């Protein structure tokens, strides 16, 4: 901070000074500037940041020797100035370990006082506990768990294996869940972990109490109102009754329900998982489920490198962690003087798990009690270059195995292990399971919302680590650790498995998985799958702690005797699950079944039918698929597992069974019946007309094996398996692996630049790059001014580019880029290495460096396998020396993921207390050093003086094992003596330089004039001498298939021509018919038109006549009407006149009458008046 302020003030003063033109004023300002510089320098030199670390980081510092650098580049002066600063040297060493150290060594020790009793999170963060009895929670650390458990096992004097107390809390990480456990005040309802996104009010209350975020994945989005509203409105459990099925509240011992009294648990128990929520919600839900509900493993299986396994039975009834079981206190009591460090007069205890592990494996009593020996396997099989399988490996008699186990249980009940009991129950259930009615066994977290679809690649129970999706280095480290541990585990126990599907395809290029793969696929014979289930199902597999910190739960399906697809709910037989993340390896078993073979096997089946003198139209039936299953089940009814789909339909629809509660409805079989009776007969497989019993007979006879997802392999494709290296550890692959891949994928024939899913494979790097990132690192288009451009692009070659046929469909629109990457010089390779960290792709550079030796090994293996200048026996001897002398030197191509997370957290803490500019300088120095190292490695590989391939033999005079007997051909094979000539004489030389042998695959396109690379992957390498004959057979088969295809195409073409000619003749005839018909129709139409015209004219004439007549009638009628109207008018007028006269007469009469009346009235009035007058006079 001070340095930034100083720089800012400098710029302001200087800019102000430059604007001042008055000379005397400048004279005043100059001393002021100098004074400012002196003050800032003094403050900086006395600040904690001056040394790069604050006081709080002192506890991180281990004792490291100073590192020297002979580099003469620009940073040498800076490096030398750092050498005397121990804290900065620690930062440099820590960063080197974090990015480029794959050796699983801890940078510090784990102790009671500094680690276990120091509270690292929650309301009491920073405080120190007095004893382990005060622990409310603690973070998982393998050093703690291993030390306590190993101490207990070694101090156990029992003569029988003891069942070890167990809690998931001690065997997987609960860091985020511990944050919930640590809180004392905030009370949470059950629905907190079942809403689509966290309730913000509860979340903020938790984080206020914690003093840190509850989770990291997309945490800032909760501050976005629109996003939060949308996230909260998604699906969630709203009904309280439904919620009770999933969750129940836990109360403290005092019964008050306060979280303060809870230890090693949250406030609720998750009883059933609900994954329709966001990842940060589901992570805590799933972790709680593991802690409170997930059943215990039956054992822990401890691997000693890849040599042996120790199996310790576990208590499965009640969960007890290291504190609750008393094992931790026992360890403290036994090791109270294990360290001389003291703090506040308290003795400290160190947890040195590696020392204890070495004592454990060297302890004879431990070996007698816990070392596992599987009589049915041969661990020495893996010492050979080739592993030969037997057809019996693909068969399994379930009924016989059940009888055998029940007899053991009866005779030796005390020695009958929990694994045997579990396996016996599983078999009993499996033999009663119909393929059409099986239930789904494995569940993924596929419904987790807004997680980029990654939930489908996580086991639903063990889903965890919300930041893993955003850290590619940690993600690849997780996958790397998982496959390495599985390979060491199977080798240590003699269990045979091999790489398959996409995992095998990834191996083909560089001996590692494709970077876009999220899991691994392995296959094994059904016999070894059953052994895996019997001895290790429900076991927690532990990696040798000296080699890594992997912990994996082996989960095997309960329907292993079901070997066909059925309803498709159980294509996977077993999973090897990372308990920290839920990532897994898919394991599938191969066996002879009644499944219809795939059409790519048609040619093989036709050849084998001829050899076996069989007719596809007359194949016998076999009950072998269900022969080992019981006919009846416990209720005395027919075992439906013995019925094929049509038999099952007939059984459940019969009158005597259709109402039985045990029998499903026929609607459950609708899709399967459609596949069997409608789709299969129309398919291209040669077996499309066979019933299930015929298919089983044929598949078993021809040694065709398949998994439950209908992936088929012939015995010859698989055996002998090739002992090779994958991710730096021994692994097996199918004998004809390239042939297998061609049947499943569109594998390019040539080893060269390749592209897929916006990634590009560069043979010079033996690495799959993100294409956009690669373009930036090569700067072909000169878009990035600070990154030098490679020189392989020549503008004068546009003509050549336009005429070049580019094999990569993805890059047809990017011919310039593809051409450039097919013409990389060594200078270009150096430049790309330098540009990768400069462009900011640190994870890419880390992966390139850490995997360099592993990918170089695969390159050398390919160079020897496909070299035409070496005889058969020379190849075999060289490959043997490569495997036994070079492979053991390979280190892991990625860092142990737990150590990576641990050191990443240390680096994060360091970054908070150390000046960022200094940190940037440290990382830049490290990058520059490792760029130089990888360029040196690349040059030595290019110029064939790579030290890894220099082998020094034992000079004691002992005969060197060259494994020659592994390649002795059968007596029936015709041998060419030249193939067994060898100029290699290891016994007379003490040194072998493998650099001198094989093809040059460093830059395969440069050695090809057409820039297409080296054609290799169109065929398999010669592994056994019989492969020469098989290669000829394969060529003959290809020739026949080609000829057959050509004949089919010719026939098809002739048929098309014939059809075309017939169609043309038909068309011509149709046109003639049409023309004739049109003429007839025309004539007919004309006649009809003429007739119509005549009829219209006649009709018109008739209408005119009629109209004329109607008009005459109308006129007559009008005259009559007029006359009538006139008469009526006249009559009306007369009547009106008459009426008028009558009214006039009447009026006159009325007037006359009125006049008379008035006169009469007047006369009367006069008379009355006269009378009155006469009366007055009287």
From Swiss-Prot:
Span list, region Disordered: 1041-1178
Xref: Pfam families: LicD (PF04991)
Membrane topology, from the record: Single-pass type II membrane protein
GO biological process: protein glycosylation; protein N-linked glycosylation; protein O-linked glycosylation
Motif interval(s): DXD: 519-521
Side of membrane Cytoplasmic, spans: 1-27
Positions on the Lumenal side per record topology: 49-1178
Subcellular location(s) per record: Golgi apparatus membrane
Applications: Mannosylphosphorylated glycans are found only in fungi, including yeast, and the elimination of mannosylphosphates from glycans is a prerequisite for yeast glycoengineering to produce human-compatible glycoproteins.
Reported phenotype of the disruption mutant: Decreases the mannosylphosphate content in cell wall mannans. Eliminates N-glycan mannosylphosphorylation, when its paralog MNN14 is also deleted.
Residue segments, region 17 X 8 AA tandem repeats of K-K-K-K-E-E-E-E: 1042-1174
GO molecular function: enzyme activator activity
Keyword Transmembrane: yes
Induction behaviour: Expression is increased at late logarithmic and stationary phases of cell growth. Expression is also induced by osmotic stress.
Disulphide bond pairs: none
GO cellular component terms, semicolon-separated: Golgi apparatus; Golgi membrane
Keywords: Golgi apparatus, Membrane, Repeat, Signal-anchor, Transmembrane, Transmembrane helix
Sequence repeats: 1042-1049, 1050-1057, 1058-1065, 1066-1073, 1074-1081, 1082-1089, 1090-1097, 1098-1105, 1106-1113, 1114-1121, 1122-1129, 1130-1137, 1138-1144, 1145-1152, 1153-1160, 1161-1168, 1169-1174
Domain of life assignment: Eukaryota
Major localization listed first in the record, in broad terms: Golgi
Membrane-spanning segments: 28-48
Domain text: The conserved DXD motif is essential for the function, which could be an indication that MNN4 has transferase activity.
Function: Golgi apparatus protein involved in N-glycan mannosylphosphorylation. While MNN4 seems to have a regulatory role in N-glycan mannosylphosphorylation, a transferase activity of MNN4 can not be ruled out. Mediates mannosylphosphate transfer in both the core and outer chain portions of N-linked oligosaccharides. Has partially redundant function with MNN14.
Family per similarity comment: Belongs to the MNN4 family.
Name of the protein this chain belongs to: Mannosyltransferase regulator 4
Gene: MNN4
């Amino acid at each position: 901070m001070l340095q930034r302020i100083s720089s800012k003030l400098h710029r302001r003063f200087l800019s102000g000074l430059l604007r001042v033109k008055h000379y005397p004023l400048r004279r005043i300002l100059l001393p002021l500037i100098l004074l400012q510089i002196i003050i800032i320098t003094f403050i900086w030199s006395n600040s904690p940041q001056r040394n790069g670390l604050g006081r709080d980081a002192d506890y991180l510092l281990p004792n490291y020797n100073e590192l020297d650098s002979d580099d003469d580049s620009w940073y040498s002066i800076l490096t030398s100035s750092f050498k005397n600063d121990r804290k900065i040297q620690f930062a440099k060493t820590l960063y080197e370990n974090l990015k480029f150290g794959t050796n699983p060594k801890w940078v510090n020790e784990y102790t009671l006082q500094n680690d276990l009793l120091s509270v690292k999170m929650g309301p009491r963060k920073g405080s120190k506990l007095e004893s382990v009895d005060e622990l409310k929670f603690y973070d998982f650390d393998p050093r703690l768990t291993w030390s306590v458990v190993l101490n207990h096992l070694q101090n156990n004097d029992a003569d029988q294996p003891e069942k070890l107390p167990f809690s998931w809390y001690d065997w997987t990480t609960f860091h985020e869940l511990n944050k919930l456990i640590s809180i004392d005040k905030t009370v949470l309802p059950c629905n907190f972990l079942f809403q689509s996104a966290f309730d913000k009010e509860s979340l903020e209350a938790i984080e206020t109490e914690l003093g840190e975020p509850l989770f990291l994945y997309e945490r800032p989005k909760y501050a976005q109102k629109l996003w939060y509203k949308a996230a909260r409105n998604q699906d969630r459990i709203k009904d309280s009754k439904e919620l009770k099925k999933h969750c129940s509240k836990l109360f403290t011992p005092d019964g008050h329900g306060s979280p303060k009294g809870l230890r090693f648990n949250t406030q609720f128990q998750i009883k059933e998982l609900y994954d329709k929520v966001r990842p940060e919600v589901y992570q805590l839900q799933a972790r709680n489920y593991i802690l409170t509900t997930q059943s215990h493993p039956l054992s822990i299986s401890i691997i000693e490198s890849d040599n042996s396994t120790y199996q310790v039975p576990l208590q499965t009834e009640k969960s007890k962690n290291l504190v609750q079981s008393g094992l931790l206190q026992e360890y403290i009591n036994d090791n109270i003087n294990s360290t001389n460090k003291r703090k506040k007069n308290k003795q400290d205890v160190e947890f040195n798990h590696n020392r204890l592990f070495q004592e454990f494996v060297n302890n004879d009593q431990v070996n007698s009690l816990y070392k596992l020996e599987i009589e049915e396997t041969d661990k020495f099989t893996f010492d050979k270059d080739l592993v030969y399988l037997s057809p019996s490996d693909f068969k399994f008699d379930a009924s016989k195995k059940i009888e055998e186990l029940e007899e053991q249980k009866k005779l030796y009940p005390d020695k009958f292990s929990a694994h045997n009991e579990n396996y016996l129950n599983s078999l009993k259930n499996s033999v009663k399971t119909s393929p059409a009615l099986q239930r789904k066994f494995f569940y993924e977290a596929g419904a987790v919302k807004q997680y980029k679809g990654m939930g489908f690649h996580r086991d639903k129970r063990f889903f965890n680590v919300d930041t893993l999706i955003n850290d590619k280095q940690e993600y690849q480290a997780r996958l790397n650790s998982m496959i390495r541990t599985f390979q060491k585990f199977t080798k240590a126990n003699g269990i045979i498995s091999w790489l398959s599907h996409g995992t095998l395809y990834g191996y083909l290029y560089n001996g590692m998985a494709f970077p876009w793969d999220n899991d691994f696929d392995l296959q094994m014979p059904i016999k070894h799958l059953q052994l895996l289930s019997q001895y290790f199902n429900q076991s927690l597999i532990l990696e040798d702690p000296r080699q890594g910190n992997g912990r994996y739960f082996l989960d095997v399906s309960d329907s292993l005797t079901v070997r066909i697809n059925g309803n498709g709910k159980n294509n996977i037989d077993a999973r090897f699950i990372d308990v920290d993340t839920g990532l897994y390896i898919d394991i599938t078993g191969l066996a002879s079944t009644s499944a219809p073979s795939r059409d790519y096997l048609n040619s093989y089946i036709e050849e084998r039918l001829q050899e076996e003198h069989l007719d596809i139209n007359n194949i016998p039936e076999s009950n072998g698929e269900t022969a080992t299953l019981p006919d009846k089940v416990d209720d005395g009814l027919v075992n439906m597992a013995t019925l094929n789909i049509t038999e099952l339909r007939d059984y459940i629809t019969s009158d005597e069974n259709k109402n039985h509660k045990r029998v499903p409805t026929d609607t459950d079989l609708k899709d399967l019946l459609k596949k069997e009776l409608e789709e299969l007969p129309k398919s291209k497989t040669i077996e499309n007309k066979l019933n299930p019993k015929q298919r089983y007979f044929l598949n078993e006879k021809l040694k065709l094996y398949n998994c439950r997802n209908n992936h088929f392999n012939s015995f010859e494709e698989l055996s002998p398996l090739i002992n090779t290296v994958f991710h730096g550890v021994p692994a097996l692959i199918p004998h004809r692996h390239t042939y297998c891949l061609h049947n499943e994928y569109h594998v390019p024939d040539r080893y060269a630049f390749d592209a897929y899913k916006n990634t590009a494979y560069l043979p010079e790097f033996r690495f799959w790059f993100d294409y956009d990132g690669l373009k930036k690192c090569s700067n072909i288009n000169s878009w990035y001014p600070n990154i030098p451009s490679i020189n392989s692009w020549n503008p004068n070659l546009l003509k050549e580019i336009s005429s070049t046929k580019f094999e990569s469909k993805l890059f047809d629109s990017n011919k310039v880029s593809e051409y450039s990457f097919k013409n990389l010089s060594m200078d270009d390779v150096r430049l790309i290495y330098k540009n990768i960290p400069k462009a900011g792709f640190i994870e890419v550079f880390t992966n390139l460096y850490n995997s360099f030796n592993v990918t170089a090994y695969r390159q050398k293996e390919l160079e020897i396998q496909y070299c035409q200048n070496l005889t058969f026996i020379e190849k075999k001897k060289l490959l043997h020396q490569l495997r036994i002398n070079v492979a053991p030197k390979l280190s892991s191509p990625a860092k142990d993921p737990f150590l990576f997370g641990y050191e990443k957290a240390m680096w994060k803490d360091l970054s908070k207390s150390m000046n960022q500019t200094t940190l940037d300088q440290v990382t830049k120095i490290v990058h520059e050093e490792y760029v130089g190292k990888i360029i040196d490695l690349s040059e030595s590989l290019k110029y064939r003086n790579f030290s890894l391939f220099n082998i020094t033999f034992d000079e004691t005079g002992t005969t060197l094992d060259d494994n020659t007997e592994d390649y002795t051909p059968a007596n029936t094979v015709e041998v060419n003596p030249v193939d067994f000539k060898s100029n290699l004489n290891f016994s007379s030389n003490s040194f072998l330089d493998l650099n001198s042998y094989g093809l040059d695959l460093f830059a395969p396109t440069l050695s090809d004039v057409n820039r297409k690379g080296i054609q290799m992957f169109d065929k398999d390498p010669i592994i056994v001498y019989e492969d020469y004959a098989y290669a000829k057979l394969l060529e003959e088969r290809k020739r026949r298939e080609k000829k057959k295809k050509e004949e089919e195409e010719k026939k098809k073409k002739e048929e098309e021509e014939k059809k075309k000619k017939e169609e043309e003749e038909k068309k011509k005839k149709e046109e003639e018919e049409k023309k004739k018909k049109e003429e007839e129709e025309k004539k007919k139409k004309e006649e009809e038109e003429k007739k119509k015209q005549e009829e219209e004219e006649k009709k018109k004439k008739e209408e005119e006549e009629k109209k004329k007549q109607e008009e005459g009638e109308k006129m007559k009628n009008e005259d009559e009407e007029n006359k009538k109207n006139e008469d009526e008018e006249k009559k009306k007028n007369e009547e009106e006149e008459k009426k008028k006269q009558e009214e006039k007469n009447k009026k006159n009469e009325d007037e006359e009458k009125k006049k008379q009346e008035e006169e009469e009235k007047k006369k009367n009035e006069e008379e009355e008046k006269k009378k009155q007058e006469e009366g007055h006079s009287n």
